[in-house]
């Protein structure tokens, strides 16, 4: 965060996210987090295998993703966390940390469980 604009932007990958209010009263956004890596053979651009945390299979990826939300994101919402951006929606050339593979043919996280977790995020959010 550069200290300007309408929101405090944080990128957190290597340590647990700890919510903190902005001293200027701006909205607090976790604008990059996660980055969990899962290689789906046959669905990658090349052999480069970058991600912030490598997981062996879809079950382990889901467990890590769900734990991340349950221990860090959901508790921060009532305290004032306004938005999050998981890294990342799709794999790209040299990064395998997407929810979808590079070719968009494999969804790495179970859609029904992801929908349920997203519902919990919405339910935890303050009502206007």
How does the language model describe each region?
Residues 101-127:
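Catalytic cores of secreted or luminal carbohydrate-active enzymes
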Residues 1-105:
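Substrate-binding/catalytic cleft of secreted carbohydrate-active enzymes
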């Amino acid at each position: 965060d550069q200290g300007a604009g309408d929101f405090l932007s944080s990128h957190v990958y290597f340590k647990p996210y700890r919510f903190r209010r902005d001293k200027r009263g701006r909205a607090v956004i976790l604008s990059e987090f996660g980055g969990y890596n899962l290689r789906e053979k046959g669905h990658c651009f090349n052999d480069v295998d970058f991600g912030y945390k490598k997981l062996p299979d879809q079950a382990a990826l889901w467990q890590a993703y769900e734990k991340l939300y349950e221990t860090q994101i959901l508790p921060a919402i009532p305290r004032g966390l306004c938005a999050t951006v998981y890294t990342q929606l799709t794999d790209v050339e040299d990064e395998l940390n997407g929810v979808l593979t590079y070719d968009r043919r494999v969804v790495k996280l179970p859609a029904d469980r992801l929908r349920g977790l997203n519902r919990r995020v919405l339910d935890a959010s303050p009502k206007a």
